[in-house]
Amino acid sequence: NQRGAITVTDGNLMMCAANDVNIFAAITLTRGTADPTRSLGLPLGLTLSADTDGTGPGVEGGTVVFAPLAPLATVTAAPVSIYYNPVSYAAPTNYGTEFTLTEGAALKQYMLVFADGGDKEFDGTTATTLTGLKGAPPGVVLVAGPNASANYTSSEAGTDKQITFTGYTLGGANADAYALPFNCCGPVVASTTGTINPAAPPPTTPPPTTPPPPTPPPTPPPPTTPP
């Protein structure tokens, strides 16, 4: 949550959160920098990135929210990138009304999409394979590269468990309107969620049944000799 005014000159600003990024106060950024001695390793310009833990889709997973009374963010001669969850993929949020952009500053906003297909049965390992995207966003597909890798953060059974992955990208006619949710600290990985179902119990083998001993036929009495 950003509640105090922020001013950046000849530098970059990145605000990210596992859930919502909330803007309550003024942001003023003038000229980003690609100079590695001053960029802090941040993307060029202003970046607002929600739902970095990959719990979407949907705003419940996290989105970028400008408070109704927040002043317009002012960006001069630098790019602005917003990564957010929309209410619906059919209704992207228009963040352009929240900014004053001058001297070539440009806004790019990306709807977050989430890899699917990672559910599996418990097998004691974390590895899984991702296929498709949750919520069927139009015009975009998940593409697995030759070194694609996906792993749960733990091997125990459970629902809504975090999966981190690398080597997957987006393709399709509208791919440039979307982005995968990446973390903002540490080694770069994307995230989604999945379920590890408990292993099915092994089938039980009934104990062998011993047949009862056969009953011998009745023995007739010996014939009697009349006196």
Q: Where do the PLM segments sit?
A:
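Detector for methionine-enriched segments
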Residues: M14-M15, M111
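Short loop/turn motifs that initiate or flank beta-strands
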Residues: R38-P43, A50-P227
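Short solvent-exposed loop/turn micro-motifs enriched in small/polar/acidic residues
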Residues: T7-V8, P187
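The right-handed parallel beta-helix/beta-solenoid scaffold, focusing on the short coil/turn
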Residues: G4, G11-L13, N19-V21, A25-I27, ...
